[in-house]
């Protein structure tokens, strides 16, 4: 038995296939979803999603959203999503370093919040690339 996974961003369907297991970053930590999981609605944090398909792990950077699990259907609505295979590793590393520097230099509440969000997004993209290279 498999999970039917559908990941949707405002402008496109990012993923639509079956998988054996999913690991998501929620607001309260990571959660694993297997077939026959109890019904669940959860908020998603900026982070990575790992997907097991035919014995192979792949990953994706998610930029926050919601996940609904019901009757082996997993529907994920996200603000943005990017498959690790679509992310340039060098660009992800450079963006992460720049975001880290901007966060360290941020002053004032608004600038710190914006720099922290940029840092989290850059880290999610880099983590997705790194997870795919380790797991793939």
Curated annotation (Swiss-Prot):
GO-annotated molecular function: ATP binding; proton-transporting ATP synthase activity, rotational mechanism
Cell compartments where the protein resides: Plastid, Chloroplast thylakoid membrane
GO cellular component: chloroplast thylakoid membrane; proton-transporting ATP synthase complex
Topology of the protein relative to the lipid bilayer: Peripheral membrane protein
Signal peptide start-end: none
Chief place of localization: plastid
Biological role: Produces ATP from ADP in the presence of a proton gradient across the membrane.
NCBIfam families: ATP_synt_epsi (TIGR01216)
Descriptive protein name: ATP synthase epsilon chain, chloroplastic
